[in-house]
Amino acid sequence: MFEATTILGYRGEMGGKKFALIGGDGQVTLGNCVVKANATKIRSLYHNQVLSGFAGSTADAFSLFDMFERILESKKGDLFKSVVDFSKEWRKDKYLRRLEAMMIVLNLDHIFILSGTGDVLEAEDNKIAAIGSGGNYALSAARALDSFAHLEPRKLVEESLKIAGDLCIYTNTNIKILEL
């Protein structure tokens, strides 16, 4: 279900300034073949106030994106209210509950994982979240690197995704990063 990508979200504060970043690799896999190495699986939403990224089935992920973006617009960019309403709406539709995709959504204050089953999970530390086949590698690397206060947030995301790309056969090191 979650093959062929790694997405990492990272938010926090450095030097009194809040930051939020999301990064992902570019690999798309169909079965056991790499069909694209430079796909974009991250995007900014609501006037560049929210970042998002997906892992899983591309068609299902776009369904997730569209639905979430519509709710985010209706809530005027309030991420917390949007994920709650997203989950409520999700659970009402039998088709939606079977989507094979996950998303990370974050802003300067919150970071959430949205699943294709309608679950909403706030990152344990409200700081780092990762999804996809290389998600556990990226999450582990990001948590370790986060303990070094001197590392810039963009560099942390980049290095964590590189580690995931080196270890996970469904993840490459063609990394794209967005930040608020």
Swiss-Prot record:
Question: What does the entry report regarding how activity is regulated?
Answer: Allosterically activated by HslU binding.
Q: What catalytic activity is recorded? A: ATP-dependent cleavage of peptide bonds with broad specificity
Sorted keywords for this record are:
Allosteric enzyme, Cytoplasm, Hydrolase, Metal-binding, Protease, Sodium, Threonine protease
Q: Record keywords: RNA-binding included?
A: no
Which residues does the annotation say bind Na(+)? G165, C168, T171
Primary site of residence: cytoplasm
| Residue ranges of the TM segments | none
Q: Which InterPro entries match?
A: ATP-dep_Prtase_HsIV_su (IPR022281), Ntn_hydrolases_N (IPR029055), Proteasome_sua/b (IPR001353), Proteasome_suB-type (IPR023333)
Please tell me whether the keyword Protease is annotated for this protein: yes
Q: Could you name the active-site residues? A: T5
Sorted alphabetically, the Gene Ontology cellular component annotations on this record are:
HslUV protease complex; proteasome core complex
Report the SS bond pairs: none
Top enzyme category: hydrolase
Q: Which GO terms describe its molecular function?
A: metal ion binding; threonine-type endopeptidase activity
The biological processes this protein is annotated with in GO are:
proteolysis involved in protein catabolic process
Q: What are its E.C. numbers?
A: 3.4.25.2
Instruction: Please state where this protein is localized.
Output: Cytoplasm
Q: Which HAMAP family match?
A: HslV
Q: Which NCBIfam families match?
A: ATP_dep_HslV, PRK05456.1
Q: What exactly does this protein do?
A: Protease subunit of a proteasome-like degradation complex believed to be a general protein degrading machinery.
Family label: Belongs to the peptidase T1B family. HslV subfamily.
Quote the subunit structure annotation.
A double ring-shaped homohexamer of HslV is capped on each side by a ring-shaped HslU homohexamer. The assembly of the HslU/HslV complex is dependent on binding of ATP.
Q: What is this protein called?
A: ATP-dependent protease subunit HslV
From which source organism is this entry? Helicobacter pylori (strain Shi470)
Q: Which gene encodes it?
A: hslV
